[in-house]
Amino acid sequence: MKKVKEAEKRNIKRKKRIRDRIGFGVAERPRVTIFKSNKYFYAQVIDDIVGHTLASVSTIEKELSLNKNISDVKKLGEVLAKRLKDKNISKLIFDRNGYKYHGLIAGFATALREAGIDV
């Protein structure tokens, strides 16, 4: 049990360190944050000043019906980029939420960049 609590403390410390480094998302440049569960992948764009979610996308959405693999996560990045362009948002702050920048996370960020979003 002690190892689990220590790991949680390290994860929280890592997230806080990343969040302090990247800053807050504002209306001109909101923050896109990532969450991975064992089955699904979630991303949401947040305006931290107001505290609102501006856009979100996940593999759990029925109309997308995607799995949690790199090719499907890249499709999620394209869908999110389209939703952001509809709202005239072209710049984001990328919050990897403590995850390493490889695999799904890197694929998602690459798809956003290829779709024309400045991350």
UniProtKB/Swiss-Prot annotation:
Function, in words: This is one of the proteins that bind and probably mediate the attachment of the 5S RNA into the large ribosomal subunit, where it forms part of the central protuberance.
Protein name from the UniProt record: Large ribosomal subunit protein uL18
Keywords: Ribonucleoprotein, Ribosomal protein, RNA-binding, rRNA-binding
Keyword rRNA-binding belongs to the record: yes
GO cellular component, one term: cytosolic large ribosomal subunit
Subunit details: Part of the 50S ribosomal subunit; part of the 5S rRNA/L5/L18/L25 subcomplex. Contacts the 5S and 23S rRNAs.
GO-annotated molecular function: 5S rRNA binding; structural constituent of ribosome
Keyword Transmembrane: no
A Gene Ontology biological process term: translation
Family (UniProt): Belongs to the universal ribosomal protein uL18 family.
One Pfam family hit: Ribosomal_L18p
